[in-house]
């Protein structure tokens, strides 16, 4: 045996094998990193300046999946108690509000006398691996806006694009799962009115209802860590149905959602949420009843008052005594304006503070707080779900869930009536790619799968 010949050939074979493996690995890595690439968008080269916020796109997919999943859990759980407890003013009286002791007990009828077929018990509502989550107005309008942004290839929708999208995807003659200001806006669109005129108080008397705050939070995720542009991006969709306090409240939520993309890893979920809320408080003018509601609930929380008592105090102060300029009771509206932006915002701040960043506890408190209880639960469930990601949501509940979403339960004319959270999250990332590159002056690194987001001035 020629030892020298054997050694040289062995080395050559080893080197050749290594190069082959290295080449294959690099090719796979490149394929993996560029898999999440929008075929309808032209990515530009970007040279980081070193003064950007850096966010992983792959982690963002998991976070957006967590948003959709937790929002669906929270939405459907909150629907169990929706409008069960709205107070005792006027002709409609619903008795004492729920407390923590009512969790796990039989659900009481809503104020109109209806019961919920999907659950007779006040408890979490889940969809197993073999099912699909039903759309509701807390998720489906956000789905429409995401679809419109992507298919129109824009970062900011025009009034005509919003109107055309609503008329295409929202039913008119049949049950359409719209209420108060959303329904008024649709009726105005049908007659030819274009947003933002659809929320003009002279045309839409429901301009101060809850609608916009449950349909526009998602815009915050499309402008990660840049609430300045997130609020700008969401302004017209918000003004499609809301003005004044209802508009400011919606911008508060959008701002918080945007900030969640750059949470401080050294802080707890609770402390991050409070930080987002405190910074987003600037969206609420100091002389607005919305800002006073926020401050009122916050003070009582830090005074150590139980959440049930804070909620009761909110009811007494704002619906009974009509303090801080909140005069909706005097307007003698149906169910004492139980779907108003203000009272439901105050209830949501109760569950935000008292839930202390715990997903399950926040959903519980939101469900038991009263009024339009599926809305605050969906808002905070979606936000916390985003912060902990889809895997974190499943860990919190110690189980797995379906990720299929039935948009055609409530809406129409989409390519896929049954969508899934992974696809929905990918579309969200593509929209965010466009915002970061075209609006924020940042960059998308498809190889490293990173966003570079310039900090605001």
Regions found by a protein language model. Give the residues of each.
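Bacterial N-terminal signal peptides that target proteins for export
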Residues: 2-14
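C-terminal motif of bacterial Sec signal peptides marking the signal peptidase cleavage site
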Residues: 22-25
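Bacterial lipoprotein signal-peptidase II cleavage site
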Residues: 27-33
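Accessory "access/gating" subregions that flank catalytic or transport cores
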Residues: 51-55, 186-207, 216-226, 235-240, ...
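Active-site cavity-forming subdomains of large catalytic enzyme subunits
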Residues: 69, 131-137, 141, 146-250
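Catalytic phosphate/nucleotide-handling subdomain of diverse soluble enzymes
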Residues: 73, 77, 84-102, 242-245, ...
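Active-site-surrounding "flap" and adjacent substrate/cofactor-binding loops of secreted or lumenal enzymes
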Residues: 79-126, 139-141, 163, 173-176
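A structural-propensity feature for long, helix-poor, extended segments
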Residues: 111-136, 407-436
